[in-house]
Amino acid sequence: GAAWRVKDLTLTPSPYLKGYLDEFLQDTRLSPLTETNRGCPFECTFCVDGVGSRQKIFKSSHDRVKAELIYIASKTRSKYLQLADVNFGMFPEDIEFSKLFSKIKNEYDFPHHIQVCAGKNNQERIIKCGEILDGSLRFGASIQSMDDEVLKNIKRSNISYEKLIEVSKRVSNTEASTYSEVI
């Protein structure tokens, strides 16, 4: 049967808020990792997030993310934050999370850089998140192949080359950095 999943992410105790990761937060070679949501609506064949049991998106609460970020910001020696979200900018809540990250940065001087995989289907929201975060955001866009037959067989569609360049240019105007990768 389908794998069981936690539907309410706030029911899982935060390892940050429990203090379990304090020693790692002091190591400048490491970056804290958190998430605002879990799951992916797409079905890419070779992606663990594309399997049927993970297709439903479960979101964390604003209060939980805020508490974790304040805790991390007060303990970490890193300037980087990794977000495990696989489609950041896809959901309306991502605007609110971007505002939260910006507020935390202004109050705690953290995070200077946020690494996240951006959603490809809502370019305006992605750009808005970049504007709110004023240079802190590092957006990644991934492709698995440039061959249409391969993409069909693996149930994936890429953002068009033209759109990728357009979004990269527009995001660059927000002072966010971008990167792409072949996965």
Give names to the regions the model predicted.
Residues 13-174:
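Radical SAM [4Fe-4S] cluster-binding motif and immediate context
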